Amino acid sequence: MRSPSLARLQTRAVFGLTRSARFQPQTLLRQRCASTAAFRSAAVAPAYQSKLGQWDQRRNASAAASAVLEAAKVNPDGLSQTAIIDNLDPVEAARLDKCRNIGIAAHIDSGKTTCTERVLFYTGRIKAIHEVRGRDSVGAKMDSMDLEREKGITIQSAATFCDWVKKDKEGVEQKYHLNLIDTPGHIDFTIEVERALRVLDGAVMILCAVSGVQSQTITVDRQMRRYNVPRISFVNKMDRMGANPFKAVDQINNKLKMPAAAVQVPIGAEDEFEGVVDLIRMKALYNVGGSGEEIMEKDEIPEKVKAIAEERRTMLIETLADVDDEIAEIFLEELTPSEDQIRAAIRRATIGLKFTPVFMGSALANKSVQPMLDGVIDYLPNPAEVENLALDQKREEASVKLVPYNSLPFVGLAFKLEESNFGQLTYIRVYQGTLRKGANVFNARNSKKVKVPRIVRMHSNDMEEVSEIGAGEICAVFGIECASGDTFTDGTLGYSMSSMFVPEPVVSLSIKPKQSKDGANFSKAMARFQREDPTFRVSYDSESDQTIISGMGELHLDIYVERMRREYRVDCETGQPQVAYRETIGNRVEFDHLLKKQSGGPGEFARVMGYMEPTGALEENKFEQQVIGGSISEKFLYACEKGFNLSCEKGPLIGHKVLGTRMVINDGATHMTDSSEMSFKNATQQAFRKAFAESQPSVLEPLMKTVVTAPTEFQGDVIGLLNKRNATINDTETGVDEFTVHADCSLNGMFGFSSNLRAATQGKGEYTMEFSHYEKAPPHMQKELIAKYVKAQADRHKK
């Protein structure tokens, strides 16, 4: 009778914990949460299984999970990831331990898609390797769009999944499940990187062995930091002339300010690149087979790299000592850490965002990709090790920690939308609970209930149907109408998750279909592209009667115009690209404006007093009311704010948005019958225009952080091109056979630069542009823009 009695006591203890969790002091709660691990240990013992059975085990695990969920609500900061992992159901713990959600990100042409193609081949996901640009009429698996294969660039992030078999330290093979997203490298498609990193647990940052850290590498680093994504680094293209992996390591340390150290050294370089030396185990690794399918290990390290291997191993330990306490103690005691201690330290420091281990290889030459995959398993976190927070709308958006238990209420984030032959495809990351086919889920943004008709795992443009997806996984769902960034729950929780960062567009152009019969397809395409891409905006200019599209650059908009032609068979006419200028106030100006129209019928009366001034930085506009004594009622002040916001949408100078302007209303007057919300809104707009004109306002133009790379023999020509565009050159780096120029350029002066650069460098130069900041436009340009706008307004009034 002892076992049943023990079982009853354990069950009562667990349920007692659940009922009383919200009333317990946090220290005691954590102790009790931890205590459920012992109950689960008993649950898998044979004697316990025979008495309770499978149902009781699930009930106990569910109770433990509920207690942790309650702790996640009450005090998310006090609930550690360790406590969450300790209370996982054993089956779930094993599943999550073998799962990695990773992305591959880098500067354009660093070899991301080529590397992903090898990963898919070595994991058995594809049967043959195909190259970027579709040279063999097939193209890389992850570049599924024809445009991607033709241009040799990734335009959309692509998701896939695969299994990687890795031997543990006892030599036993362990299978790991990878959810993998390949991202674009071009700055125009940066939103694809943003939304991928928003939902991933780790990343592989790829660098070119020749160029090292480049402009988009810095952008990717900033995005990884924004979402707290740990990364390992892979120095690719070791077979290229001028390859110098240690320059890349130094640049990660110095340019990215991220502690980094090589965990491998190359055996040879350029056309003599043979393999790598594993600095942790001090073994030489070579790829063998027609496509490098097998890794051959040798205990003997080639003499030519022995010295540098010893030196770099010492540097690895020294760098780890700076970021990990355990290694620091060993280092100070002048002891040598073991292999396991080094691996554990790298893992702790990498997951803690303090360090990145650097691997080396050549994806195109099929060398050293598999050791990088081992690094993904060894050093990047599983879903249970990553802290994810949501906002509880029922408790004034208080932060709550999400717990990756399948038995808990479902919470997921829609991070990407895509049109397919079967309708809208919504990519979802499941953070908590289970998403099941046929289940009802609720959109936290609009509280709409939708049914999940079909769940698939994506493999680029192919898909495999599944019945359910557990916590920590990524999937795609058909038949759900939503927007990118929407949170879905099972309806019992009022949770919503913060969305990804969406940069503002910098380039616009007018567009219309060449034939009026294509209007329906044109509208359908515009609606779809906006839904899929938050950086692609569509607006209608009533004054010019034109549809305006806005995006991150010329290439961004060109791609959508071409997609419209290919996917919807709509040929379009486009205007010249237009720069997204801004306007800003000059000096502080006080105003006292009276709007008075009283002519027998219902009149208008509103008096507003106050001042306008710069905010001190070119940032968001601010409206404040400092009215004392109730001279203007709350509803009229709300109308004043509305009038201010409308005025900022279209400035008086050239009709562009206003930045960095603050309006304060501190007094005014109303009329008993003639004052209305409309009159105060109009009065505020009139006061805004008058005060803005008196403040010596300015037109602002966007400056672009521009990086140009070309062979050294064209350096003079490239500098000349930039000088013609009044660029401010900030830095120049000269390498063995190429140079890089960093400059700030006016976006207005960069239209057509791509063609000029190709002509000046015989097609060998490349450049990237990224929005930097707004700055006052030159006086002559301001006069031209204002005169052009005034003339256009006058011409419209004549009509």
From Swiss-Prot:
GO terms for molecular function: GTP binding; GTPase activity; translation elongation factor activity. GTP binds at residues 106-113, 182-186, 236-239. The gene is mef1. SMART domains: EFG_C (SM00838), EFG_IV (SM00889). InterPro entries: EFG_II (IPR041095), EFG_III (IPR009022), EFG_III/V (IPR035647), EFG_IV (IPR047872), EFG_V-like (IPR000640), EFTu-like_2 (IPR004161), G_TR_CS (IPR031157), P-loop_NTPase (IPR027417). GO terms for cellular component: mitochondrion. Mitochondrial GTPase that catalyzes the GTP-dependent ribosomal translocation step during translation elongation. During this step, the ribosome changes from the pre-translocational (PRE) to the post-translocational (POST) state as the newly formed A-site-bound peptidyl-tRNA and P-site-bound deacylated tRNA move to the P and E sites, respectively. Catalyzes the coordinated movement of the two tRNA molecules, the mRNA and conformational changes in the ribosome. It comes from Penicillium rubens (strain ATCC 28089 / DSM 1075 / NRRL 1951 / Wisconsin 54-1255). Gene3D superfamilies: 3.30.230.10, 3.30.70.240, Elongation Factor G (Translational Gtpase), domain 3, P-loop containing nucleotide triphosphate hydrolases, Translation factors. It is found in: Mitochondrion. The lineage of its organism: Eukaryota, Fungi, Dikarya, Ascomycota, Pezizomycotina. Residues 1-33 form a transit peptide. Belongs to the TRAFAC class translation factor GTPase superfamily. Classic translation factor GTPase family. EF-G/EF-2 subfamily. One of its GO terms (biological process) is mitochondrial translational elongation. Keywords: Elongation factor, GTP-binding, Mitochondrion, Nucleotide-binding, Protein biosynthesis, Transit peptide. CDD domains: EF-G (cd01886), EFG_III (cd16262), EFG_mtEFG1_IV (cd01434), mtEFG1_II_like (cd04091). Residues 97-384 form the tr-type G domain. This is Elongation factor G, mitochondrial. Pathway: Protein biosynthesis; polypeptide chain elongation.
